[in-house]
Amino acid sequence: MKFSITLALCFTLSIFLIGSQAKVPVDDQFRVVNEGGYTDYSPIEYNPDVRGFVPFSDNFRLCFYNTTPNAYTLALRIGNRVQESTLRWVWEANRGSPVKENATLTFGEDGNLVLAEADGRLVWQTNTANKGAVGIKILENGNMVIYDSSGKFVWQSFDSPTDTLLVGQSLKLNGRTKLVSRLSPSVNTNGPYSLVMEAKKLVLYYTTNKTPKPIAYFEYEFFTKITQFQSMTFQAVEDSDTTWGLVMEGVDSGSKFNVSTFLSRPKHNATLSFIRLESDGNIRVWSYSTLATSTAWDVTYTAFTNADTDGNDECRIPEHCLGFGLCKKGQCNACPSDKGLLGWDETCKSPSLASCDPKTFHYFKIEGADSFMTKYNGGSSTTESACGDKCTRDCKCLGFFYNRKSSRCWLGYELKTLTRTGDSSLVAYVKAPNANKKSTL
């Protein structure tokens, strides 16, 4: 018995030593300095300056890019410069923590991929030092992997999505459970939108520093009883002998049963597609064809379209009208005020209050107006006047929405985009300072 235990311990120790002694061959090590001229001059998403380098595959390349001077993101882009079509970004290492000129990316003998400033300050790493890594590469599906001598992945970019999922990439219960939008095309920090894999559904949320909790504004439906999603994968599935479809495929952790929601059917190769939560709060699927030239990209799915018959047009996106506005069929066409509906432009904003004292403000009413928050958030059951009283007592409440048919109430901590419905049972009330004309509840 002692011999067996000793043998097992020796075997385990030998495996550990072999793994810990594995080193990256000199020819596979690299140190890249973020300096010199720019390398990619094709149309590039977000219109940045780009420096590309190894590793790369036929359709993917690792790059430094910046949309503001001296603030670089380490990212993977998809596209081929030969096609003269837009290059797009599908993965980022250091969103919100940009590096400067002369920053370094190092893949050394110990197998750790390290992004550091010129002075040596660590910005990002894969935490793969001394874990048996022997190489790094980008697979044909866009997954950048660090692997050991047996080919097993020690680290993979697919485990850390930002706002994008490539085909075969997942949100996972025991890993990254959400995508987060970037703030804008020119500002690469986290934006207010997130796509979250919850226990039984996939939900779009809107969050700002004014909202007490994230506000759901869209849900993907799965018409099967689910216990708990273990993962949610953007997947290409064979639709027929000649076509492929793109789906979001969930795996139930209890039954291991797969459920999916269909997204699109690209006319070209579906495997070079990605789904992204855009900075504008919409979700789009982009499909890339290596056969095309200047029209290599197709948007094959959009969550919010102006042709949507289910009420999910662009007016349901919280900041579609930027700061404030009344919207219909995707068009922001009025700026609500206590003087009536004024013409809308980008300067439209909800009224500002100088005080929380109810004596200093009033409400103006918008008949037939709805909010992005009402469809997927239950609200509370109460009377219209009680709903108003609740908002009046809450200093952070900017207005409220009421459904007279269902007697449901929603308090608005962010008003943003309102939808013009033509349904008089839906009414919005907005707080305004008393210096202006007063409307009553």
From Swiss-Prot:
Cysteine pairs bridged by disulfides in the record: 387-409, 391-397
CDD domains in alphabetical order: B_lectin, PAN_AP_plant
Signal peptide span: 1-22
WD repeats: 254-296
A GO BP annotation: cellular response to hypoxia
Entry's induction text: Up-regulated by fungal elicitor. Up-regulated in both heat- and senescence-induced programmed cell death (PCD).
InterPro entries: Bulb-type_lectin_dom, Bulb-type_lectin_dom_sf, G-type_lectin_kinases/EP1-like, Pan_app, SLSG/EP1
Glycosylation sites recorded in the entry for this protein: 102, 258, 269
GO cellular component: a single term: plant-type vacuole
PROSITE patterns per the UniProt record, alphabetical: BULB_LECTIN, PAN
Gene Ontology molecular function, alphabetical: carbohydrate binding; glycosaminoglycan binding
Domain Bulb-type lectin: 29-159
Entry-linked Pfam families: B_lectin (PF01453)
Localization of this protein: Secreted, Cell wall
Domain PAN, first and last residues per copy: 356-433
UniProt keyword Plastid present: no
Keywords tagged on the record: Cell wall, Disulfide bond, Glycoprotein, Lectin, Phosphoprotein, Secreted, Signal, WD repeat
Modifications the protein undergoes after translation, according to the UniProt entry: Phosphorylated on tyrosine.
PANTHER family in UniProt: G-TYPE LECTIN S-RECEPTOR-LIKE SERINE/THREONINE-PROTEIN KINASE SD2-5, RECEPTOR-LIKE SERINE_THREONINE-PROTEIN KINASE
Job of this protein: May be involved in a cell-to cell programmed cell death (PCD) signaling mechanism.
Entry protein name: EP1-like glycoprotein 3
